Amino acid sequence: IPMQNKAFSMEDLFAFLNAGVSAFHSTAAAAAILEAEGYRNCPESAAWHLVPGGKYYTTRNGSAILAWRMPKGPLTGWHAAASHSDSPTWRIKTLDGADHGFARAEVEGYGGMLMSTWFDRPLSVAGRLLVRTADGVESRLVHPERALACIPNLCIHFNREANTGLNYNPQVDLQPIFGAEGGSLKDTLAAEAGGKAEDILATDLVLCITEKAQRVGLQGEYFMSGRIDDLECAYATLYGFLQGRGEEAGRGDIWVMFDNEEVGSSSRQGAQGSLMSDVLARIEESLGVTKEQSIRARTNCLLLSADNGHAIHPNHPEKSDQKLPVNMGGGVILKYNARQTYTTSGLTGAAFTAICEKAGVPVQTFANRADVAGGSTLGNLLGRQILM
């Protein structure tokens, strides 16, 4: 069933969450959906031959992806939705090591995470291998769908402070074990990718949990999954993008999923890179748009930065602003911050609220307590680059 004619399905969301075990895998999953919907891949290194009303996508680094629908008439503006492909995890620094009878691999933290949630659970590995071939270097996705590792907690007998506020040292406490000494993670991943260990030239690998997305609650009203931040929003906005029918002839539509939001978005595949501005420039050139027309079209745009927000924690309601309660199932959230770490202003908030009212979607307002700094996301970083 074409996505445009398909009702939103939690099972489809779960499939996307389960597939996105690394930024490379979530990008590949999104590309597969776009291909099935008739979008044509435009590699950045190739010449583009764009036509009015055409459907296209491009990727960068294999971990960021941007899809667009060309306007059918003279360009007048854009609708855009942005999210990110990465999630907090542990980046693997070394593939093979051993000590005290265990096979080991060194990791370092990626993004902001609750370290304690990584202990004592089955873990696997996901990402890409850069492999030597007869034709050069090839990128291969890899994800053994079985438990390969765990990060063992120190037992209570050796750590009496474990339940009273322990500070974890990631270099010491969060290093995983991969079985008994003598096993080789490099050999395992090479076999998984259909190659040889000696042909692996480099890797981009992370740890991932092995549990699948699932419903929870007495009525199945909630769900739990890894990587909800931000693949939930990535999938929801992709679904919405594919529902679009291009009612306005002069308006183009963009969906983008950047990488490296969790570490500041400053990479070439992040929101502070040139991916979106490069694509816009090539689209505008194909349409014969002048600089004047470009600026006018970009200012006639609504950019939605879609990332997760915080509902009231039932055990710690005092952590939320009680005057602005956000409840699970209460509707989408508009996030405001005086430090401008989100994109929402009075103008954009009003526009978004009006759109939601028309669609019958409830809207909640979120702001941190005045004594809590809160987080940030990519929208404000992107908006200042492309004037949207």
Go through each PLM region and give its residues:
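N-terminal hydrophobic/helix-forming segments and targeting peptides
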Residues: P2-M388
